[in-house]
Design a protein with these regions (language model features):
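Short, solvent-exposed turn/loop segments enriched in Gly/Ser/Thr/Pro and often Arg
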Residues: 79, 140-143, 159-165, 185-187, ...
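N-terminal glycine-/serine-/threonine-rich beta1-alpha1-beta2 phosphate-ribose binding loop
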Residues: 2-175, 193-206
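C-terminal helix-rich "cap/oligomerization" subdomain common to oxidoreductases
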Residues: 14-38, 157, 342, 439-505
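Ligand-binding pockets and gating/stacking loops
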Residues: 57-68, 75-78, 87-88, 98, ...
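Structural recognition of the beta-strand scaffold that forms the well-ordered cores
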Residues: 44-48, 69-74, 139, 157-158, ...
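A contiguous active-site-proximal alpha/beta segment in oxidoreductase catalytic domains
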Residues: 178, 185-261
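Non-transmembrane alpha-helical segments in soluble domains
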Residues: 13, 58, 118, 144-147, ...
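Glycine-rich, aromatic-lined ligand/substrate-binding cores of catalytic
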Residues: 50, 255, 260-446, 458-465, ...
Length: 505
């Protein structure tokens, strides 16, 4: 086993975005930029995106007494056609949150939209908080109108589909607002880079939700930095997703009418023009390259954030991928359908990372659609099965198996875990993600997953979705933001914008 590494608070928190993930320690109010919220004041938030995930996160925000939800926004007014984890899942959560066992009685399906968000906010502040002077929550259809009219906002929270995240975040930061968004910052690499650049220029307090408060991350860092399994050479990460449709080889041809109360133009945002179809909207947007990043972007940010901290990763130097294919019999012969519009039903992606200081080069392997790596012999020695989702560190002197994002880690086989002398706890354990961002809005340390810190993570994931379409090993120059061996793949780093929605990438 390697000799004990020197571990301290600064080595874990302080790092360059091009070499490792870390938090700056300079209070943000020293840097200037948007107005910072006094510790005695609430962070006044405009909440953009009230679909199912938006409603779930909205209820989390409302529980934080340090914030005030001033207004909500969504392109959909109110409908009962949203997918959910199981029947009445969201309705029951809302009932519990509002202490109202009859909320949603008579709904034909899962209900969400801006009017639902408004109703939840107003009911919570009046009934649960008992605010006698509460003036209500305004609901907007267009985020641009919200940013123009709501002069007293300190920040925005973005829970829209992925293709809108960067567009809204950049507009908000340029208006002097702090920003917190669901992952990813964007489904297009050039927009990830622009959002990080804008955050740095405006000094906005930013955060991307990516499970950035796991206590197992500093724990695993302490293990690996102390040589628990020697130099880590490989990491394997696998998920059972997608749960939504993928593998489509063409865009929908049907042109149903746009539902009443749904602004298709605003939902489409910067993406190329096309007729409305429900195959694009709500949770199923993730399967289309134009709107999402598939299971890699949906789940990968949760695990990759931990890996970047544990292994001090920066940008990869290469990426390659393999994917499931779709064939049909046409006129008595086999016909392969070339897929350029949606992510595959199953895929593997592989990135190569260079040496970082005294840490060896490492290859990161991703599997989705039920694919996973071979079962390690160390797990067979314990007569245990490979979990449906997981994270496996392969070192020169052993292996660590954990849950998908690093939870419940253990050295395998069990006898090696029992013999392992655990190092002392020397690294700080992170606070709640929303609390990290609130602290930054008040002029304190930036959140761990601020845009500058997650830029290389988000870019790595975007490179993975590009590799799925390129079908070859791609060489990546992060400094020049360029794929150096494939001009067509390099074009996929950029979005084809609708007129009037362009960003200066």
């Amino acid at each position: 086993m390697d000799t004990e590494k020197n571990i301290n608070r600064r080595s874990f928190l302080g790092a360059s975005s091009t070499a490792a993930i870390g938090m700056m320690v300079v209070p943000r109010h020293v840097l200037g930029g948007p107005k910072y919220v006094a510790p005695s004041d609430k962070v006044n938030i405009g909440y953009i995106g009230t679909g199912t995930q938006g409603i779930r996160v909205l209820m989390e925000f409302l529980r934080h007494k340090e914030v005030h939800i001033a207004c909500v926004c969504d392109a959909n007014r109110d409908s009962q056609d949203y997918p959910e984890w199981h029947k009445n899942e969201l309705r029951d959560k809302i009932r519990h949150f509002l202490d109202n066992p009859t909320w949603g009685t008579g709904n034909k399906g899962c209900r969400a939209g801006r009017e639902v968000g408004k109703e939840i906010v107003e009911t919570y502040y009046k009934k649960i908080r008992g605010l006698s002077n509460y003036k209500g929550c305004k609901a907007y259809e267009d985020y641009r109108e919200l940013l123009e009219k709501e002069k007293d906002l300190d920040a925005v929270c973005i829970l829209t589909p992925e293709h809108l995240h960067a567009t809204i975040a950049i507009a908000a930061m340029k208006k002097g607002k702090h920003v917190i968004t669901h992952k990813p910052v964007s489904n297009v690499l050039s927009e990830v880079r622009l959002a990080a650049k804008t955050a740095a220029e405006t000094k906005a307090a930013t955060h991307m939700f990516c499970s950035a408060a796991r206590h197992t991350t500093p724990l695993l860092s302490e293990w690996i930095w102390n040589g628990a399994i020697g130099q880590v050479r490989e990491v394997h990460n696998w998920t059972t997703r997608p749960f939504w449709p993928q593998g489509m080889t063409e865009y929908p041809k049907e042109t149903p009418p746009v539902p009443d109360g749904f602004n298709w133009d605003l939902w489409l945002g910067p993406a190329e023009e096309r007729p409305f179809n429900p195959a694009y909207t709500h949770a199923v947007f993730r399967g289309w390259y134009d709107f999402g990043t598939g299971p890699l972007g949906d789940m990968g940010h949760y695990s990759f954030y931990q890996l970047w901290r544990i292994l001090k990763l920066g940008s990869p130097v290469s990426v390659e991928a393999s994917r499931s294919e779709y064939w049909t019999i046409e006129d008595g012969s086999w016909h392969k359908h070339i897929n350029t519009v949606s992510l595959p039903r199953a895929a593997t992606v592989h990135w190569e990372f260079p040496q970082r200081g005294d840490m060896a080069p490492v290859t990161l392997h991703w599997y989705d659609g039920g694919l996973r790596p071979p079962i390690p012999e160390e797990l067979e020695m314990d007569n245990r099965k490979m979990p449906p989702e997981g994270l496996l560190f392969v070192g020169d002197e052993g292996k660590i198996l954990a849950g998908f994002a690093g939870n419940s880690p253990r050295i395998i086989p069990e006898k090696q875990m029992k013999a392992f002398k655990r190092p002392p706890e020397t690294l700080p354990r992170p606070i709640d993600e929303i609390d990290q961002w609130i602290r930054a809005c008040r002029g304190g340390e930036p959140a761990g997953a601020c845009f500058e810190n997650v830029q290389p993570i988000n870019e790595t994931i975007c490179l993975g979705t590009v590799a799925l379409r390129a079908d070859k090993k791609l060489k990546w120059d992060a400094d020049k933001m360029k794929i150096t061996n494939d001009k067509d793949a390099d074009k996929l780093l950029y979005r084809k914008y609708r007129k009037g929605w362009e960003l200066d990438v």
